[in-house]
Curated annotation (Swiss-Prot):
SUPFAM superfamilies: DNA repair protein MutS, domain III (SSF48334), P-loop containing nucleoside triphosphate hydrolases (SSF52540), SMR domain-like (SSF160443). One of its GO terms (molecular function) is rRNA binding. Endonuclease that is involved in the suppression of homologous recombination and thus may have a key role in the control of bacterial genetic diversity. Acts as a ribosome collision sensor, splitting the ribosome into its 2 subunits. Detects stalled/collided 70S ribosomes which it binds and splits by an ATP-hydrolysis driven conformational change. Acts upstream of the ribosome quality control system (RQC), a ribosome-associated complex that mediates the extraction of incompletely synthesized nascent chains from stalled ribosomes and their subsequent degradation. Probably generates substrates for RQC. It comes from Streptococcus equi subsp. zooepidemicus (strain MGCS10565). It comes from the Bacteria. This is Endonuclease MutS2. Residues 703-778 form the Smr domain. GO terms for biological process: mismatch repair; negative regulation of DNA recombination; rescue of stalled ribosome.
Length: 778
């Protein structure tokens, strides 16, 4: 493809319009390198990707990938055995996160058939182990203490030393307050110092680090603090060395995967570019064109992408039509129409949507050539005509039957008669070699050429005779006409002068009258066509509205069913609470035995409806997210640290990467990071009472509620107390942990309400403290 045409059509400015919709630097890089191609299959693949992205957005309106930096240089540094900086590791961490999210998104994608994008999604790799390791660096770029035992130890020592240093300074501050200009601890050269009055500088033993501008205050590091600060400085040096070692270790883990990570970045960048194309298409009301099997083109309501509020025009370039000649005066929009065709074709062959209506067709040309604008060369001392002709000669040498040529004001810049003759001769040569060409001209001689010559068609830009302004409407099949007499008359030129001029060009006046009639017929046909299009658009909008209403109705119905189920459950809960009160009163009257009470409660609980709706698509989908999966981010309950699941082991155990450490965890020892966002159904679990060795206080049992959801915990607690009563337990332990306090408070509330609980309180500090509640039954 000739580079010059991309400059003349300002293709770079068109590409800039896609920038706001991009989220990744890799997508930006791919867009920057984007140029027209002549491979029909590849262009069709681009269009298929775009259509599939549109289908994704129908189901997922907010599909996004997240901001990604270009990691290509970082991967090159890894290949050269260099270690990555914290910032580079953060960028790789983000890449791993987005890769994992893309894999999960694709795994959960429903109701969308993908072909082209399927290949992209399935090539994206997830790296849970690497993702877990890089949790050692938080999003602010801080290396966490759990990254290594050594770093944690060093930071603990630093904290202790800093505390001791502050304590010592506070003591000195109190003892020598009389010698200080201010009662505060300052910092100079990274050292903690005291602001001492210069007159008392010898009263405070230590090292002088600075002096105030007035000289009245000296900043002294007390001698007693020097050794502490030196130890602290050494520890800070050790911390930096350990962080460097951790960065090296993380880089070593990434190094074998540099190629895969680079490939992931490209795949995500390409998906981002496809997403940007779709968003541009929606914002600009653009469309994916159909690719013709031949060289025919059909642009429906085509607009120039770089013009504010452009006039939309139709263009039909049949396969057997070789040349379209746009005639008429300047400033009517001929050049804009020429560029509109050129840009539509260039954008389409670059895999971009075009600013035209759905149903538009484009061809695939091996070469697109143009001679547009003023090409005068001062350096070569060439005239405008010579410059244009030099370029035209080069185009004629290169073009063939698989080319598209655009000429603006062909033959201009020389004697009108000679220019018109040259223009006709050039167009005739292109017609004979079957090279699709669109040319603009203001030479009237070319109108006759367009009428008399086969496979050549005239066209023009419409002119409003009332306002004396161009309408920028493209009139295909109608040659341009002169409006000089009408304009002169309306501007006030004497009528006898206008008539005398018309008499001198009587023949041309007749031609203009015929052209005017053709224009009128064309305008009427266009109005009828636009009316038909409006009706079609109204029908399309109606169909979309009906579909939207149906979807909203279905969604509302599901919501109402959920609401009804919740209301029913609330009613049953109230009934259960009331029954609990009644049964308790009966028990106090000794009218029922404990096992009979529990059996009655069980029968009442059977009245509770299932919480979930089996037909509810929303809850069905949420259910899929409930089970842990390899690559999920987790929070380890015991440490409160974040990690990533590596592999599933037996007995519901998982291998997880937390910082640089691998752990084996049970499913109840961690929680999924996004668990709170997911709708889950409570599982029915049998509550097992674990008897402990009898003590002086009688048999005891223990219930562990850590990691349980509120409703699940309350169900298990209720069943547990029932079982304890049946087993004549006098005391039970309920382990709920500290956490957010929600379960702990709920346990207390339940025990206060239960008539069979005599008393309860937190366990001793050595037996769980506020993380465990001991209840006495009776």
């Amino acid at each position: 493809m000739e580079k010059k045409i991309l400059e003349q059509l300002e293709f770079e400015k068109v590409k800039e319009q896609f920038w706001p919709y991009l989220q990744t630097e890799q997508g930006q890089l791919e867009l920057d390198l984007l140029e027209p191609i002549a491979n029909k299959d590849k262009i069709q693949a681009y269009f298929t990707e775009l259509e599939e992205m549109a289908a994704i957005f129908v189901e997922h309106h907010h599909f996004a990938l997240g901001g990604l930096s270009d990691v290509s240089e970082s991967m090159q540094r890894l290949d050269l055995e260099a270690d990555l900086s914290i910032q580079e590791l953060l960028e790789v961490k983000k890449l791993l996160q987005v890769s994992a999210e893309a894999c999960r998104f694709y795994a959960d994608l429903e109701n969308v058939d993908l072909v082209a994008l399927k290949a992209l999604f399935e090539k994206i790799e997830s790296f849970p182990s690497l993702q877990g390791s890089l949790q050692a660096i938080n999003d602010a770029g801080f290396v966490e203490g759990f990254a290594s035992p050594e770093l944690e130890s060093i930071r603990r020592q630093i904290s202790n030393k800093e505390h001791a240093s502050r304590q010592l300074l506070q003591d000195i501050l109190k003892k020598q307050a009389a010698y200080l200009s201010e009662s505060l601890i300052a910092s100079r050269n990274g050292r903690s110092v005291l602001p001492v009055k210069n007159t008392y500088r010898h009263k405070v033993a230590g090292v002088v680090h600075d002096m105030s501008a007035s000289g009245s205050t000296v900043y002294i590091e007390p001698r007693a603090l020097v050794s502490l600060n030196e130890e602290l400085t050494q520890l800070q040096t050790d911390e930096r060395h350990e962080i460097g070692r951790i960065l090296h270790e993380l880089s070593e883990q990434l190094r074998p995967h540099s190629r895969s990570l680079r490939n992931n970045a490209w795949l995500l960048g390409h998906l981002d570019l496809v997403r940007a194309k779709y968003l541009y298409m929606q914002a600009k009301q653009a469309a994916v064109p159909v690719i013709s099997d031949d060289k025919s083109l059909q642009l429906l309501n085509a607009r120039h992408p770089l013009i504010q509020n452009p006039v939309a025009n139709d263009l039909h370039f049949a396969n057997d039509l070789a040349v379209i000649v746009i005639t008429g005066p300047n400033t009517g929009g001929k050049t804009i129409m020429l560029k509109t065709l050129g840009l539509a074709q260039v954008m389409a062959q670059s895999g971009l949507p075009i600013l035209a209506d759905k149903g538009s067709r484009v061809a695939v040309f091996n070469g697109i050539y143009a001679d547009i604008g003023d090409e005068q060369s001062i350096e070569q001392s060439l005239s405008t005509f010579s410059s244009h002709m030099t370029h035209i000669v080069e185009i004629l040498k290169q073009a063939d039957s698989d080319s598209l040529i655009l000429f603006d004001e062909l033959g201009a810049g020389t004697d009108p008669q000679e220019g018109a003759s040259l223009a006709m001769a050039i167009l005739e040569q292109l017609r004979l070699t079957n090279i699709k060409t669109m040319a603009t001209t203001h030479y009237p001689e070319l109108k006759a050429y367009g009428i008399e010559t086969a496979y050549v068609e005239n066209a023009s830009m419409a002119f409003d005779n009332v306002s004396l302004k161009p309408t920028y409407r493209f009139m295909q099949g109608v040659p341009g006409r002169s409006n000089a007499f009408d304009i002169a008359r309306r501007l006030g030129l004497a009528e006898h002068i206008v008539k005398e001029a018309q008499a001198m060009t009587a023949t041309n006046h007749d031609v203009n009258r015929i052209i005017e009639q053709l224009e009128q017929q064309t305008l009427e046909s266009r109005k009828r066509l636009e009316h038909i299009k409006e009706v079609e658009q109204d029908n399309l909008k109606f169909n979309r509205a009906v579909k939207k209403l149906y979807n909203e109705f279905s969604h509302a119905k599901d919501k109402e069913l959920e609401k009804a189920a919740l209301e029913a459950r609330e009613i049953v809960d109230m009934a259960l609470a009331e029954s609990e009160s009644i049964l308790s009163q009966l028990h106090e009257k000794a009218e029922l035995k404990p096992h009979e009470i529990i059996e009655a409660k069980h029968r009442l609980k059977q009245l509770v409806p299932e919480q979930s709706l089996s037909q509810n698509k929303v809850l069905k989908k949420a259910k899929k997210w409930r089970a842990p999966r390899v690559g999920d981010d987790i929070i380890v309950t015991a440490y409160g640290q974040r990690g990533t699941l590596l592999a599933q082991l037996k007995d519901k155990r998982w291998e997880a990467q937390v910082g640089l450490i691998k752990l084996t965890l049970k499913e109840d020892e961690f929680s999924l990071v996004k668990l709170k966002e997911e709708a889950q159904q409570p599982k029915k679990r049998a509550v097992k009472v674990v008897k402990k060795a009898a003590t002086g206080k009688g048999p005891r049992a223990r219930l562990d509620l850590r990691g349980k959801r509120y409703e699940e915990a309350m169900q298990e607690l209720d069943a547990f107390i029932d079982q304890a009563l049946l087993n004549n337990m006098s005391q039970v332990d309920i382990i709920h942990g500290i956490g957010t306090g929600v379960i702990r408070e709920a346990v207390g509330k339940y025990l206060r309400r239960n008539k069979h609980v005599k008393s309860f309180g937190y366990a001793p500090q050595n037996a769980g403290g506020s993380g465990c509640t001991i209840a006495n039954l009776g």
